Amino acid sequence: MEKIPMTRAGFAALDDELKLLKTVERPAVIRAIAEAREHGDLSENAEYHAAREKQSFIEGRIKELEALLSLAEVIDPARLSGSIKFGATVTILDEETEEEKTYQIVGEAEADIENGLLNIKSPLARALIGKDEGDSIEVKTPGGERGYEVVSVRFV
């Protein structure tokens, strides 16, 4: 299987979530199922069905996290330099609005655009890869093409 690039922080966050699910959430839902069973008829027991549904979600998320972490290739951006690549923290200037935005290019599993974590497979990240400070790019968006200038590239 193909390795999934991930920052050290992204790996740690997913690993922490996995530990929480295994040590806190899973035991809690098992207790909730046991308590709900004590209330008798399971066919009309809403507490039981809700707990089983939550258990199903938790077990699915545990499997998903275990798979992601087993395929993770942790990349330390601080050891990189040069043009924009995975792990780079990039400040860009929207040529239309003159607004500056800063993003770190990360893997799919840790992407969170609202917190400045840009999915490496996104159109913007793909357009930025290989570029340097001062370069301009055009990105196709649902609202039409947008132009950006690369203001700075850092590896932190």
UniProtKB/Swiss-Prot annotation:
A Gene Ontology biological process term: DNA-templated transcription elongation
GO MF annotation, one? DNA binding
Q: Which residues form a coiled coil?
A: 46-73
Q: Which UniProt keywords apply?
A: Coiled coil, DNA-binding, Transcription, Transcription regulation
Domain of life assignment: Bacteria
UniProt cross-references to InterPro entries, sorted A to Z: GreA/GreB_C_sf, TF_GreA/GreB_CS, Tscrpt_elong_fac_GreA, Tscrpt_elong_fac_GreA/B, Tscrpt_elong_fac_GreA/B_C, Tscrpt_elong_fac_GreA/B_fam, Tscrpt_elong_fac_GreA/B_N, Tscrpt_elong_fac_GreA/B_N_sf
Q: Which family does it belong to?
A: Belongs to the GreA/GreB family.
**Purpose of the protein:** Necessary for efficient RNA polymerase transcription elongation past template-encoded arresting sites. The arresting sites in DNA have the property of trapping a certain fraction of elongating RNA polymerases that pass through, resulting in locked ternary complexes. Cleavage of the nascent transcript by cleavage factors such as GreA or GreB allows the resumption of elongation from the new 3'terminus. GreA releases sequences of 2 to 3 nucleotides.
According to UniProt, the name of this protein is Transcription elongation factor GreA
Q: Which organism is it from?
A: Cereibacter sphaeroides (strain ATCC 17025 / ATH 2.4.3) (Rhodobacter sphaeroides)
